[in-house]
Every structure is written in structure tokens, then in C-alpha cells.
Amino acid sequence: MAQPRCWYAHGHWIQGHGCRVIPSLAFVHIPINATDTLQAQAGDRPNYQPGINDEVPVCQQSQGWCRDGRYDWDKPECRYGGHDELFMRALASTPGVMGLFYGHNHGNTWCYRWDTLLPGMAVEGNGINLCFGQRTGHGGYGNWIRGAREIVVTRDKLKDFSVDTYMCLESGATVGAVSLNATFNRDWYPATPNDETETQT
């Protein structure tokens, strides 16, 4: 199997910025393996990682793929093929990346700070915050309330590589407000309600 090329790992986007650490955020559709491992290890901590945690385990990148590139969900050794390891290494080795944001799992809306080597993983986290969004559209599965994760970026907070984020729901409510900073995972927050809406036909 050909080795995947990770455009992110090459760092060409840093050139021309005086080689200083640039605060940044990353966005993908499907969560990385560290998300599934954090969920399994930490469990449900609604006052430290507020959000809905209804989809266990996380549907993640490389799910159902064998290491040799074959898709075979029925083989236990192919439940996770490791094809996102290069991307995780690039994220964990890039200074200034404050958060990775994704969706895909409609029933998960939490964030978690990945700052250790997790059991069964070959990549050690560097303090990047991993965050789900909120179910946004009227298609797809589930009856979780629709909304959006909003990310508030200010110059003052960027000096400390910190951003604020919360969910703005279709009901008008704001839930899950947290500061993604050096003490996230240890700071206490109100739990997020698990609200649902009727599916429109």
C-alpha cells in the first residue's frame, strides 16, 4: 500500500511568517483516533468536558480499515487501521495549534484537551483541544437539537493561545461555554443539557 502523504506535516504554510509560532485552529469532518481513546479512557465528565456524549464509541477516521488498506469491518483487527497516525503526529508536533474541530458524530458535542500519551496510541498529545460541533442540518440521523459551535477568537486571548467556544442552539439557548486554555480539563463548567427536537418531514 502506498504511504499517505500528509500535506499538513510539511509546514510550507509557515514560510513567510518569520518562523514565529502562529496561533491556529484546524477543521476536519471526521474525528481522529485520539478522540475515541480519550472518550474510552476519561468517560463522561459533564462538568469538565460539557457536552452531549451519546455516541460511544466515537466513529473515527480509519474506522473499519485494516492496516494493509483493506476495508473489513468484521475483523476485530480492522476496527481501527491507524491511517490517521501521520495526521495526528503532524498536529501534535505543530506549535500553536489550539484546537481541532469536527462533526460526523451527531450525538457528541464535547471538547477534550489531549496532552498525554494515551493507552494503545503511538502519538503523544501536545495540549491540542479536540472538539465536536453540534448537529446542524435537518438531514441525517438522530433527534438532537440543532445548532452550531461558535468559536470566539480575540487578540488578547490569542496571546495565551486560548479561545472561547460555546453552542448556539436553534432554540436560541447558549450551552457548553468553555475556555480552551492551558487549564481546560481541570476547570469546572455547567453541564450541557441533552435536548432534542422533532424531526421535520
Where are these regions (language model features)?
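His/acidic metal-ligating clusters that form di-metal
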Residues: M1-T109
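Binuclear metal-dependent phosphoesterase catalytic core
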Residues: D72-K75, N108-T201
